[in-house]
């Protein structure tokens, strides 16, 4: 952080941030000097190695995204971190996002932390994509999240390694998919013998 950049702590919207996997308070950095300055940051998740910038004002986003808990890193401009509760029992338990979903709204730019390769897919109206439940990073609030059986038979559930369900997201909107942080953590924890 350069000189002239001041920090302050804000607890505005703390309940929504806390329910969506963030700290109750957030640090706000401001350059009050009038000269060029910067603040450097890194992802805060154990194996996250990517910073994904998303412009909330872009046409396919329409000012609101839903994302994985704890993936919010930073933002600038008009951005609020909130919570959206999903009361559909099957979706809460099996779609990979949980009961309290992180909702980010505004017209600024948000930075999410992710792991591995990040893929962005623009979905047209009614277009659907199936995703491993651990790999959803974020999606436009205009999209619909649901679940779909991963396999038709019992042997597929038991032997495929996919579990019982995949997440299905239907457009219009944008979906961001990344490698599962849980899977990378397991891989990194193994010995190299």
State what each model feature region is.
Residues 1-193:
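Composition-driven recognition of glycine/serine/threonine/acidic- and proline-rich low-complexity segments
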